[in-house]
Each structure stands twice: as C-alpha cells, then as structure tokens.
C-alpha cells in the first residue's frame, strides 16, 4: 500500500512505516497529479490522519496541479448509504421522428429527480448519422455517435438506434418506453456508487467555462468525464422527419470531455462557448461521472449548475438543482 492510499484510508500505522523507511521530506511525496498524502487525508475527511501528517512535517500549503492546497480539496468520502445514482443517457436526433417522445420522457425524469431530490442525472447525446439531405442536427457530433457505437461493441451487441436510452451503462431500452426506463432507473438506484465524484464551476472568462471535477479511489480501465448540458432549448425544424415541428429539448450535451484515470484525480475541464453549439446558453449545467472503459459501467456521478449570464457568480458548493 502506498503512503497516499494509506493516508486516504486513515491507516496511520502504514504511513508511519513509510516515514520510517524514507526519512526527511517523504511526508510530502507527490503523485503525478501533485497530490500529497495530506491532500488525500483531507479529501477523505481523515482528521486524525491529517493531524498526524501535519505533526510530521506535512506542507499545509502544498498545491496540486489544479492549484489546490489540501484544505481546498472537496470532501470525497463516499457515504454508501446515500450514494445510489442513475445516469440516464439518451441518444437522439432532431431528424428522428421517434425521438420527441423520448425527449419528453427524459425531461420528465429530470423534473422528477429535482422534485424528489434523487441522484438521477440526464444527458442527451445528439448523433450525426441522421444528418444530411434537408436537415442537419445543430447539436450532433460524430464523437457522440462513436460513444453509442462503443456501447454496441462493449455492452449491447447489435443494439444501435435512436431513440436509445442507456442507464448507468448497464441497461438499454427504447427511449420512449416509460415502464422500461423507470425499471432501469429503479434497479440502478438500489446499488450504491463505488466512487465519489465532485464537480463545480471554478471560473468564467471571455467565453470560456472552467469546471473542476474530482474523484478518488483505486481505478483500472476507467475515465472521468464531464458533459456540458443546456436545458429549455426550443428549435423550429425545417427539414428531415420532423419538418414543421418545434422541438423542446432538455439535457442537450453541448460539449463532452473525458480523461483516463490512473488513481485519484482532480482535473479541470475548459469549455469555450464560442466553439460549441447552443441556443441562448442559459440553463447550463455540468454532469460529471466516472465510467469503466472496458464494460461501460458507471461507478459514480454528480452535477452542478453553470452560471453564464452577466453578473452571475459560480456556486460555492456543487448542486444538482439546476434548471
């Protein structure tokens, strides 16, 4: 066990052994992300361990690659009793005539989650394989189509269509099948998360939004991802299967980024709103999650509101209550 793992687990005996073997400044040894043992102790709420490290020369002001001192690390201690979650992904297109009912169902799921304070997070990925001819989806992205194909390859053999709803990377159904959707969500909400995730907006300047997402745990074949989403979009469609209709859309993914995990990680994701599609860029949010890359199963998720309008300030604490 490394000194960082021991600090996160509160194992003072193991930490003491490391310090005896490596006298001097080993108490401040760093990971590739520049986390010290004290960062891990703070992130897990290990007060006794934190005091022990400080008594043995830990640097209280040591900064990781995000510029965070140990006291700046969000609490990443996982409360298994309250960590159940469901990440609902909808694969959709403005050019798909079967998709509007699925869009409405996903919006209903989000409203229910907010009203009941459930850890249900919704993201709608617009695929690009409907584009062409008389209409191209303004939110489509080839990367989103590739993500759906990854599910087909790694999890759901032969299952590749719109509207497709995928819950926690484990269950899939037609996106407008209400009973199937809620069955998958209820199954997911019976199982605790296995990692803690924190996400918050950290700055905003000149068309860019920065989101700090952190997670902690032992990872293999996993990635930390953040989706920038917008709610309350209305679009008049003038071509394709939905020609003549005005579509109302929530949870629309404007931009999506991932980093592979090799241990506890804090990462800053920057989104340039000048370069992403969008409506009025109001009602923005960020959904962060940790997902296995081998079988696509979700390990944990969280969300926060994104402030973009002039005069708005970032939330001090993460919140899933954005509209």
Annotate each language-model stretch with its function.
Residues 5-11, 40-46, 73-76:
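Ankyrin repeat A-helix N-terminal signature
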Residues 11-20, 46-54:
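Ankyrin repeat structural motif
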Residues 100-114:
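Typically the conserved alpha-helix immediately C-terminal to a functionally engaged Cys/Sec
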Residues 117-145:
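Thiol-based oxidoreductase modules, predominantly thioredoxin-like and allied folds used
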Residues 136-164, 168-323:
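Short, conserved sequence motifs used for protein processing/export or organelle targeting and
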